[in-house]
Amino acid sequence: MCKHYHQAKFLLSCPSLKGCPPDQGYEVIFAGRSNAGKSRAINTLTLQNKLAKVSRTPGRTQHLVFFELDKDRRLADLPGYGYAKVPEHIKVKWYKDMNEYFNQRDCLRGAVLVMDVRHPLKPFDQMMLDWCNNIHLPTQIILTKSDKLKKIAASNTYFKVLDQIKKYSYVDVQLFSSLKKQGLKKLWTRLDTFFGYVD
């Protein structure tokens, strides 16, 4: 199953929705708060070290970045959200662009919401969940950096988040570690359903 993701390659980067690829095929978004480990998760998912650039300055990347799996399937890396040092006018633009993106892209097939296991379900995460839920978009929450916590603490956070998302349909959660490759096979399996690789 990993071969689909290992062949991912950079497609394009755009500052606004006008530059997005044609609204067709299968598109799965990766979204998360700045510094949640989103770029590293994408690199781990694709078994590549430098596909998604890891910024040393959280909130720096304000472009939508698309990675192509094949001519019909794409990963969309959304700008990191919720970082305090981002100017207010950029936050406002981000909110407007994301609202339009979620409501206008008919090709959306799934979402991966990336959350630091030590700081899950912050207000911006909740907003992303609501957007996904409003358009009935299947969603996988990955609690990254699980290696930073002891096993019991990580497990407790997992069950706490699982309980809090019961009100949402089509949402699942898992622990994930880019360092130890924890949860990688489960994420591949979930993405296979998003991309139509399995019935």
Swiss-Prot record:
NCBIfam families: GTPase_YsxC. Necessary for normal cell division and for the maintenance of normal septation. This is Probable GTP-binding protein EngB. InterPro entries: G_ENGB_dom, GTP-bd, GTP-bd_ribosome_bio_YsxC, P-loop_NTPase. Its cofactor is Mg(2+). GO terms for molecular function: GTP binding; metal ion binding. GO terms for biological process: division septum assembly. Keywords: Cell cycle, Cell division, GTP-binding, Magnesium, Metal-binding, Nucleotide-binding, Septation. GTP binds at residues 32-39, 59-63, 77-80, 144-147, 176-178. CDD domains: YihA_EngB. One of its GO terms (cellular component) is cytosol. Belongs to the TRAFAC class TrmE-Era-EngA-EngB-Septin-like GTPase superfamily. EngB GTPase family. Mg(2+) binds at residues 39, 61.
